Amino acid sequence: MRELQSIIDGGNPYTEQLLNAWRKQLDDFNAGAAVCPLPNFRMDDDEEWIDEYQRKYEKKGRGLHFELLPDPFRGDPRAPVWILLLNPGYSEVDRYDHLGLCPLCGERLVRADRKTTSHENGCAARFFGSGLPDASAALKSRQDMLIEELKLDLSTPRKFLWIEPDFHTVPEENVTLAGKGGSLWWKEFLFGDGDSDGYLLPSCGIKQPDIAIGKRLFALESFPYHSKKFDSSFLQNEKFCHSDYFKFWCFLVGWAVESGRKIIVRYEAIRKVLERMIGKSAYANNKGNIISMASINPSLTIGNLCGKNCRANSMELVESLREVLSGRE
């Protein structure tokens, strides 16, 4: 079995050179005029299949948002439990978290070295309930953390960024104005409205925010770009399957299977990709480590892991998840 570090060093498509170029895009945008081109964070080798995807799905409300940094990794891949998801979501709140753009009007709320206008302060008061909750330094800090997350650097502590306080920028009572951002989505997915015992992590003693989450759980998106909705059938697209990102995804997931990680599969489309990738026989032999979530409820609850669509032995699998998450194994 290949070492995880070797897989990352040889396969991570988010190279230092690429990330430096993206960081410069962000710096230029932060310092730019009130109206200036948005950053464009697409991989060069993705152009062909991106064009195909956008032609088929953009007008159906499933277009990709390249102004936001790809966000496929959360937590530490050495964690005992992995969860495979579809792709990073999108709302106008994410544009604020990534770029400092107003979730309501789309104009700049945060830029380097300048005061906000009365119009911008009006939007801020309406959306945040007061003036701007942070400044350009806080925006740059979030951007830096998102860039660092793409490196998958195992020599530094790996956090679950979207439940970190730095990413909780919007009062929850105001999310109806512009949709849920990544922070609220992940908190609801992992913990619900609070630390309910009906959710897997709280039942293991993991509360929010807790550094143990990044050490115990690794989340991996099957597709790296943001969209409000995503057509999962595109995971079968031949051009996408030859992309650098998907090849890296396969190497990572292959390592997780071989090393005996517990793997939670979020969607049936991902389960089919996983089964095709490792083969039906190997998939069957690893059923003790793979559990599919019921598709009805989007939250990481024990009930969703033991839903009527899951296997009869799902409660046994959930208990094994709880053992490794709580460190009892």
Report each predicted region and the residues it spans.
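Conserved beta-strand->loop/alpha-helix structural units within folded catalytic cores of enzymes
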Residues: K60-L64, L252-R261
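Charged, often glycine-rich, active-site loop that binds/positions anionic groups
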Residues: D45-R62, A212-Y245
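An N-terminal domain-cap segment
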Residues: N30-R78
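Adenosine ribonucleotide-centric catalytic and binding domains
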Residues: E58-K207, S281-P298
